[in-house]
Amino acid sequence: MQRYQVWNPHPDAMPAVNIIEIVERSAGLRILVQEYETDRLLAIFFDTHEAYQRRNESWVAGEASRTDGLGKGSYYVVENSSFIARFFAESLLPRKGIRHFSIITDSLCMDILATENPRTEYVKK
């Protein structure tokens, strides 16, 4: 069974966010989130990522019944990840040390597989 552990991407990060923008470039993956309580924008940069998937909010209800630990904010690291298992099954060169980061909001869910923690910084509107 997948288990969701709360992840804090930044010491000042608020738990409830909305994903504003997703940009993938050769320099990596950038996810821009807006905090509900403060309206601040937090940029989350994955300099290297192996894979990511984006799902709509209808996924959350079904996933919550099959997992442990959801409902404690927007940011998680997933243990016993089915996404990692699927990635290894379909990949020609399985990698070591891959972690599954998940950002879950009211309208969008992002799952990112990466070997390093992302960089984060607050940005101006």
Give the label of every model feature segment.
Residues 1-125:
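Surface-exposed, interaction-prone regions used to assemble/regulate multi-protein complexes
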